[in-house]
Amino acid sequence: MFMINIISLIIPILLAVAFLTLVERKVLGYMQLRKGPNIVGPYGLLQPIADAVKLFTKEPLRPLTSSTTMFIMAPILALTLALTMWVPLPMPYPLINMNLGVLFMLAMSSLAVYSILWSGWASNSKYALIGALRAVAQTISYEVTLAIILLSVLLMNGSFTLSTLIITQEHLWLIFPAWPLAMMWFISTLAETNRAPFDLTEGESELVSGFNVEYAAGPFAMFFLAEYANIIMMNIFTTLLFFGAFHNPYMPELYVVNFTVKTLALTILFLWIRASYPRFRYDQLMHLLWKNFLPLTLALCMWHVTLPIISASIPPQT
């Protein structure tokens, strides 16, 4: 029975990821005053299926000098971790209701760094290695602010359980009292998922395509799926933290619709940002984090800790 539950979570995620690629190409197309894919199937709806078939039927080439085991393990690990992070998400009921769901997701996103590092190192190519090192430095750096922002939000929530965030936001979305945090959180999620304008790892002019430059066919598709699954997952996380969807136990369908619409809006915003902004320079990226975001988030975290104490009460504990 548990296996059926897992499969019923994984298959919709993979389908969502497949069609997100189509949405991205369509949105970018219309933003550049062109149509986007519209040949394969009605309105190009079968394009993701054609892409998947094309990728998985190609020969998985491997460089002679690469480390075989690690080279194959890296994309598998990336996809596994990307799918594992969906387990504690309440939609409205999680697959596994964890007490420390937020901590679990933070730990999983930190582990994803290893798959990038392994892929860059195992490829035995200098482009891949430079791309991987950039990606790792960027991901680790932005995780610092993500963790501090999470801590500040959870002080208002009172526990590390994701389900309590829904109850906390029944009357007021947390984006209103914590809008500076929400702003920094959103920019940090862009950097965390290696999206434009922070897609330094894929600097085409200097690194071809970053850490996955030596990958082809199936393993490349796995990295691709992992990246897009992480994008949707981060947007779901943002929705849970700041745009709490109202949950009526008698009508869970309403929650699902509410939740999906907010997640979709954030995902379209990701694509809109990609179409609008040029890529950052590497030093600007690091400067933004260590000199701007980190002091601000630390100050706001202290503010969130001291405010309840000043007003003669302790933070909520559930």
UniProtKB/Swiss-Prot annotation:
One Pfam family recorded for the sequence: NADHdh
Lipid bilayer topology: Multi-pass membrane protein
PROSITE patterns: COMPLEX1_ND1_1, COMPLEX1_ND1_2
Primary location class: mitochondrion
Catalytic activity as recorded in UniProt: a ubiquinone + NADH + 5 H(+)(in) = a ubiquinol + NAD(+) + 4 H(+)(out)
Compartments, as annotated in UniProt: Mitochondrion inner membrane
One of the GO biological process terms: mitochondrial electron transport, NADH to ubiquinone
Transmembrane segments: 2-22, 70-90, 100-120, 147-167, 171-191, 223-243, 253-273, 294-314
Record EC number: 7.1.1.2
Stated role: Core subunit of the mitochondrial membrane respiratory chain NADH dehydrogenase (Complex I) which catalyzes electron transfer from NADH through the respiratory chain, using ubiquinone as an electron acceptor. Essential for the catalytic activity and assembly of complex I.
Protein name: NADH-ubiquinone oxidoreductase chain 1
Organism, scientific name: Halichoerus grypus
UniProt gene name: MT-ND1
